[in-house]
């Protein structure tokens, strides 16, 4: 059985959990990180020297980096579903995976901290506003990316949709004003209909 290490409210862990659920894989989820600690334990660091989450164990295969885990699970278990055999089409999907990780992470982390996690007295309104503007710009790029195809993976849902899908849930749940992004909103509406997305991603923001 697969083992996925990481707290369920982590956006990066959600990628792994969502992928596993889309593929109907049996897995054990182990809480580490955040309030659970454990990331500096020698046994954990022996598996992931970065001391970060998620971590995947599949028999003798041990992987870290959330996008790598998503790719691995899709390639190993999703040949007829999430994985894209055509190299050029797969590269288009993977482009969006890597773009999401580099474009969203810093601004998203700041918003989570200064809108959700910190006590109000400790929040930095200027940094929050700057980060919200950055997220809005990234979401506009994502919106434009959906003008020519219904999914970031092309004509069908696939690996390219998973990273942005995890960030999009929080974006649409934040108590903020959002610009009109019709292509992104349509795509998000279809994501919300997927049972695996509901179970793995649509959890309370904490």
Task: Walk through the language-model features, giving the residues of each.
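Carbohydrate-binding/catalytic loop surfaces
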Residues: 117, 205-206
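Charged phosphate-binding loop/patch that engages nucleotide di/tri-phosphates or the phosphate backbone
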Residues: 193, 197-200
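Conserved beta-strand edge residues that scaffold enzyme active sites
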Residues: 34-35, 160, 205
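GST-like fold's C-terminal all-alpha helical module
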Residues: 100-193
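Short coil/turn segments at secondary-structure boundaries
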Residues: 109, 201-204
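GST-like domain detector, emphasizing the conserved glutathione-binding G-site
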Residues: 1-129, 143
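Active-site-flanking alpha-helical
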Residues: 74, 167-168, 201
């Amino acid at each position: 059985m697969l083992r996925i290490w990481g707290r369920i409210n982590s956006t990066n862990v959600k990628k792994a959990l969502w992928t596993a659920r889309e593929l109907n894989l049996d897995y054990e989820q182990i809480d580490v990180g955040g309030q659970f600690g454990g990331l500096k334990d020698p046994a954990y660091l022996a598996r992931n020297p970065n001391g970060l989450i998620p971590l995947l164990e599949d028999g003798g295969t041990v992987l870290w980096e959330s996008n790598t885990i998503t790719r691995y699970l899709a390639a190993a278990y999703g040949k007829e579903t999430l994985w894209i055999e055509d190299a050029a089409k797969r590269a288009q999907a993977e482009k969006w995976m890597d773009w999401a990780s580099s474009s969203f992470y810093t601004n998203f982390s700041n918003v989570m901290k200064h809108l959700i996690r910190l006590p109000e007295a400790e929040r930095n309104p200027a940094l929050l506003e700057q980060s919200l503007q950055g997220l809005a710009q990234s979401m506009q790029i994502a919106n434009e990316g959906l003008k020519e195809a219904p999914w970031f993976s092309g004509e069908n849902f696939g690996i390219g949709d998973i990273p942005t899908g995890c960030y999009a849930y929080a974006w649409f749940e934040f108590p903020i004003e959002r610009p009109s992004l019709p292509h992104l909103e349509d795509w998000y509406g279809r994501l919300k209909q997927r049972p695996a997305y509901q179970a793995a991603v649509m959890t309370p923001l904490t």
